């Protein structure tokens, strides 16, 4: 149970559009593809860590104490998984877009996967550069299958430590018991993405000033324990449980005291993901 100073990673909201597609057909690929991603390329891949701590005064956003602990923990964890880690600090929204564009244009053909971690303030659908918001969808679109061909069919993981709104979770007491590939196979451009959000849609995300955020602490801990034993979704389920059961906010302000948090995983992965082979 955490009892140090806790903070949140919050800010503004955006509309989104719903499109309806009429008609469909069944497609038989003619081949039973491997059930897990090929992870034995010469390189595991790049892991970008965007760590935004200090924000322009015009944004009205506070400094994110504890985020450097997260960045260091993530660097150690993903280097241990053989990723090429690139730490980027205090990027403006323009810097972030330029970085994503640049990395997406690299040749990833000898890399097994791609990881991007964003530590910042946020709200539903947006994260904050040091000078203002940028849509998360705009950042991830650079890595779609039709734009970044050398990552097509490979896992692209986006890990987001940021608020997704201003709701607070008070918690509730429980009463419970104890490849072979086909040359011309077509896949959706949004396939093979996974988004690991620190909190559920609409909610605050908590961060400890000394130990870092609840989510990143838990993610790194579970990866170090299970990355060479379990499939990634199973690891993330353990992360969810750890955050949900082992953390609670402590604040002198009763509005923010004794609050809970649950991470949210959105997966468009099409195969199982193991960090070992």
Swiss-Prot record:
Expression tissues: Highest expression in spleen, lung, liver, kidney and heart. Lower expression in brain, skeletal muscle and testis.
Its biological purpose: Thiol protease that acts as a major effector caspase involved in the execution phase of apoptosis. Following cleavage and activation by initiator caspases (CASP8, CASP9 and/or CASP10), mediates execution of apoptosis by catalyzing cleavage of many proteins. At the onset of apoptosis, it proteolytically cleaves poly(ADP-ribose) polymerase PARP1 at a '216-Asp-|-Gly-217' bond. Cleaves and activates sterol regulatory element binding proteins (SREBPs) between the basic helix-loop-helix leucine zipper domain and the membrane attachment domain.
Post-translational changes noted in the entry: Cleavage by granzyme B, caspase-6, caspase-8 and caspase-10 generates the two active subunits. Additional processing of the propeptides is likely due to the autocatalytic activity of the activated protease. Active heterodimers between the small subunit of caspase-7 protease and the large subunit of caspase-3 also occur and vice versa. S-nitrosylated on its catalytic site cysteine in unstimulated cell lines and denitrosylated upon activation of the Fas apoptotic pathway, associated with an increase in intracellular caspase activity. Fas therefore activates caspase-3 not only by inducing the cleavage of the caspase zymogen to its active subunits, but also by stimulating the denitrosylation of its active site thiol.
Regulation: Inhibited by BIRC6; following inhibition of BIRC6-caspase binding by DIABLO/SMAC, BIRC6 is subjected to caspase cleavage, leading to an increase in active caspases.
Disruption of the gene: reported phenotype: Lethality; the majority of mice on the 129/Svj background die in utero or within weeks of birth because of many extra cells within the brains of these animals. Defects are caused by impaired apoptosis. Mice lacking Casp3 on the C57BL/6J background are viable. Mice lacking Casp3 and Casp7 on the C57BL/6J background die immediately after birth because of defective heart development. This suggests that Casp7 can partially rescue Casp3 in certain conditions.
Residues recorded with modification Phosphoserine: 26
GO molecular function, one term: peptidase activity
Primary enzyme class: hydrolase
Protein name: Caspase-3
Family: Belongs to the peptidase C14A family.
Top-level taxon of origin: Eukaryota
Protein localization: Cytoplasm
SUPFAM superfamilies recorded: Caspase-like
Catalytic residues (positions): 121, 163
Propeptide: 1-9, 10-28
Gene Ontology process terms (BP): anterior neural tube closure; apoptotic process; axonal fasciculation; B cell homeostasis; cell fate commitment; cellular response to staurosporine; DNA damage response; epithelial cell apoptotic process
EC code: 3.4.22.56
A Pfam match: Peptidase_C14
Residues carrying S-nitrosocysteine: 163
Catalytically driven reaction(s): Strict requirement for an Asp residue at positions P1 and P4. It has a preferred cleavage sequence of Asp-Xaa-Xaa-Asp-|- with a hydrophobic amino-acid residue at P2 and a hydrophilic amino-acid residue at P3, although Val or Ala are also accepted at this position
């Amino acid at each position: 149970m955490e009892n140090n100073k806790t903070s949140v990673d919050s800010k503004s909201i955006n509309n989104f559009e719903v499109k309806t597609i009429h008609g469909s057909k069944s497609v038989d690929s003619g081949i039973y593809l491997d059930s897990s991603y090929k992870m034995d390329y010469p390189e595991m891949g790049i892991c970008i860590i965007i760590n935004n701590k200090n924000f322009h005064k015009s944004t009205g956003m506070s400094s994110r104490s504890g985020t450097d602990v997260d960045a260091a923990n993530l660097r150690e964890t993903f280097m241990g998984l053989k990723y090429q880690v690139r730490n980027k600090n205090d990027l403006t929204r323009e810097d972030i877009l330029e970085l994503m564009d640049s990395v997406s244009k690299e040749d990833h053909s000898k890399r097994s996967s791609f990881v991007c971690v964003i530590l910042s303030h946020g709200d539903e659908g947006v994260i904050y550069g040091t000078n203002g918001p940028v849509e998360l969808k705009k950042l991830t679109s650079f890595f779609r299958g039709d734009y970044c061909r050398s990552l097509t069919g490979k896992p692209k993981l986006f890990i987001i430590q940021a608020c997704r709104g201003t709701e607070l979770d008070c918690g509730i007491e429980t009463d419970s018991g104890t490849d072979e590939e086909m040359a011309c196979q077509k896949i959706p451009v949004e396939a093979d993405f996974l988004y690991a959000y620190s909190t559920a849609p609409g909610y605050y995300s908590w961060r400890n000033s000394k130990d870092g955020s609840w989510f990143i602490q838990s993610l790194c801990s579970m990866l170090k324990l299970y990355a060479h034993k379990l499939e990634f979704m199973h690891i993330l389920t353990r992360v969810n449980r750890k955050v949900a059961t082992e953390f609670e906010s402590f604040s002198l302000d009763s509005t923010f005291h004794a609050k809970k948090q649950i991470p949210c995983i959105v997966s468009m992965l099409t195969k199982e993901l193991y960090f070992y082979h």
